[in-house]
Amino acid sequence: MVPVLKVFLVDDEPLARLRLRSLLEACVDPRAEVVAEAGAASQAQAWLRDHTCDLILLDVQMPGPDGLQLADILREREGPTPAIVFVTAHAEHALRAFELDAIDYLTKPVRRERLQAALCRVAQRLAE
C-alpha cells in the first residue's frame, strides 16, 4: 500500500500554495494529502498546537516570523516535530535550513521531480 503523507503548506503567497498543491496532487509514491494551509508562521504555529502532520512545506521569507524562525520554535517544543522541507526562492538560506534538520530545501519554481524526491525522503524517515 502506498503511504499517504499529511502535508501542511506554509507560504505567504497564495499562488505558491496553489502551485504546491497542484504538484502534490501529481505525486503518486508516496502520495500526499494537504491537510491545512497557512499564510504566516504565526498561523502555522497556532494550527500546530492542536493538529499534527507528517510534513511541513515551509517558505523561508514571510512577514513576521520567517520560516527559519518557525522551524527553530518547532524544534524546541516538546513532542514529535513534523518533517520540514523548505520551499523558497532564496537559496542562500540552505545551510541554516539543514542546521534546523530540514529534510530538503527546494528552490522556486519547484519541479515535480524534486518534490517527489523530497516526499520519498520524508516517507523513508517516517518508516525508520
Language-model segment annotations:
Residues 10-11, 38, 56, 88:
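Conserved sequence signature across two-component system core domains
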Residues 6, 33-34, 81-84:
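Short active-site oxyanion
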Residues 1-8:
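Non-catalytic signal-transmission and effector/linker regions of two-component phosphorelay proteins
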Residues 2, 13-19, 53-55:
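Conserved N-terminal glycine/acidic-rich loop preference
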Residues 14-36:
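Two-component/phosphorelay signaling modules centered on CheY-like receiver
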Residues 35-44:
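Conserved Asp/Asn-Gly motif in the active-site loop of CheY-like receiver
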Residues 45-128:
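CheY-like receiver
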